[in-house]
Amino acid sequence: MAGCDDGEILLLAGYPFHMKQPAERMSQLFDKYDSILRQVLGSEVVGVYSMGSGAIPGMVGSPMIDILLAMRNAPPTEDQLSKLKEIGIGLIGDGKSPHDPSDTWFQNLDFPTQGNFEEFKANGAHPPDGYLGRLIVHFCPYQSQFVHNSLCYVKYLKQNKDAFNRYRAVKIEGARMQCDGNEIKGGESGMSAFRKYKMHKSKVVKDLIEESKTWGEKEGNFNLPRELM
């Protein structure tokens, strides 16, 4: 896109939006949590996957990562909630994700004592919401359609250049409209710049989700990982 600086970081009400994601460090963070989640939750874990923008190489956006945690049971039991709390992971609100009824979502509120997370700290402390080191965990039953659709969506955007470009373009457009210091912010709705950015891209995201479902239904385009079948 013209005028796009790969090294540029925009701020949306204080939330960083990277024109070039710190992909290697995001992958390192995912690997650390993949290992710890499997250790803590044991055999109830079927699979741990990267989802959302952070799972799509070359995509712009927040450096936060989204982890899709495919479980044999869902929603989480009290014992599982306790185990997640011990590694610094707590429910977002009441845990009911707006994405899907089968999705119980969490965020990391502190780093686990297992492993070394020093490189992900900000000024020696757990980073603020929206920054590298923060993440969302989607706790879902492994056979749910949400798991299937989330993984199919990522593969579709990895393989379809037009879909990738449309998603990237609307994200950049929305971020530039709402970045700190930009006067083109619309009326005083009381809605945060980050929320306005999310709404700006929602129509394109909805279209891409439906496209990915149609694409995934064609033989040979998408297969679930073996452990989910």
Predicted regions mapped to residue ranges:
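Helical scaffold of the NTase/Pol beta-like nucleotidyltransferase catalytic core
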Residues: M1-Y49
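Short, flexible turn/loop "capping" segments at secondary-structure junctions
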Residues: I9-L12, M59-S62, D129, H148
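Short amphipathic alpha-helical segments
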Residues: Y15, P63-I67, G133-L135
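Short histidine-centered catalytic/ligand-binding loop motif
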Residues: Y15-R25, L68-R72, C152-L157
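Active-site nucleotide-donor binding segment shared across nucleotidyl transfer reactions
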Residues: I36-E78
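Short amphipathic alpha-helices in soluble, non-transmembrane regions
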Residues: D79-G88
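Conserved catalytic core of two-metal-ion nucleotidyltransferases
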Residues: G88-Q143
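Catalytic cores of NTP-dependent nucleotidyl/adenyl transfer enzymes across multiple folds
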Residues: R134-M229
